[in-house]
From Swiss-Prot:
Biased composition (Polar residues): 1-19, 80-91
Biased composition (Basic and acidic residues): 96-108
Subunit-level organization: Interacts with the complex composed, at least, of APC, CTNNB1 and GSK3B; the interaction takes place with the inactive form of GSK3B (phosphorylated at 'Ser-9').
Purpose: Modulates negatively AKT-mediated GSK3B signaling. Induces CTNNB1 'Ser-33' phosphorylation and degradation through the suppression of the inhibitory 'Ser-9' phosphorylation of GSK3B, which represses the function of the APC:CTNNB1:GSK3B complex and the interaction with CDH1/E-cadherin in adherent junctions. Plays a role in the regulation of cell cycle and cell adhesion. Has an inhibitory role on AR-signaling pathway through the induction of receptor proteasomal degradation.
Recorded name of the encoding gene: JPT1
InterPro entries reported in the protein's UniProt record: JUPITER (IPR033335)
Organism lineage string: Eukaryota, Metazoa, Chordata, Craniata, Vertebrata
Keyword Glycoprotein in record: no
Modified residues (Phosphoserine): 28, 31, 71, 80, 87-88, 92, 131
Family: Belongs to the JUPITER family.
Annotated compartments: Nucleus; Cytoplasm
Protein name: Jupiter microtubule associated homolog 1
Length: 154
C-alpha cells in the first residue's frame, strides 16, 4: 500500500490536511472576485508603457534614432493627440444626438450656414469625390465555403 504525504497548514501544531493553505509566494490566492482590492506589483521594466506616465530614464532605442527629445517628446505627443481628435470631431459634421438635445445641433447648423454665407466670395476647394465603384456581379448559383449546397430543387 502506498502512503501519501499530507501537508500541514500554516500552524505547525494544526491537524494534517491535504489542502495547501498558503501559496509559495506568501499571501492567499483564495479569491471570490469581490471586495478584495488587489494591488499590482510595480515593475520597473515592464513591456507595456503608459502614455501619460512619468518619462522613463532610458528611452527605447527607436526613440533616440527618430530624433525625439527626451524632455519634450512626450508633452508634444500628448498635446497634439487631443487637438487632432477635437478638430476632426468639430469638422466632421456627423454628430449623433444621444441625449435628445436637437436644439444644440440646430444652432450649429445656423452658425454653419451663416459662416458659409459670409465666405461665398472666396472659392473653397472641394474635396475630391471618389467615383462610385460598380459592385461585382453576383453569380446566380453560389456554393457555401464547405462544398456543395444542400438546396434541393424539385
Amino acid at each position: 500500500m502506498t502512503t501519501t504525504t499530507t501537508f500541514k497548514g500554516v500552524d505547525p501544531n494544526s491537524r494534517n490536511s491535504s489542502r495547501v493553505l498558503r501559496p509559495p509566494g506568501g499571501g492567499s490566492n483564495f479569491s471570490l472576485g469581490f471586495d478584495e482590492p488587489t494591488e499590482q506589483p510595480v515593475r520597473r521594466n515592464k513591456m507595456a508603457s503608459s502614455i501619460f506616465g512619468t518619462p522613463e530614464e532610458n528611452p527605447p532605442s527607436w526613440a533616440k534614432s527618430a530624433g525625439a527629445k527626451s524632455s519634450g517628446g512626450r508633452e508634444d505627443a500628448e498635446s497634439s493627440g487631443p487637438q487632432r481628435r477635437n478638430s476632426s470631431e468639430a469638422n466632421s459634421g456627423d454628430f449623433l444626438d444621444l441625449k435628445g438635445e436637437g436644439d444644440v445641433h440646430e444652432n450649429v447648423d445656423t452658425d454653419l450656414q451663416a459662416s458659409l454665407g459670409q465666405s461665398e466670395e472666396k472659392p473653397v476647394p472641394a474635396a475630391p469625390v471618389p467615383s462610385p465603384v460598380a459592385p461585382a456581379p453576383v453569380p446566380s448559383r453560389r456554393n457555401p465555403p464547405g462544398g456543395k449546397s444542400s438546396l434541393v430543387l424539385g
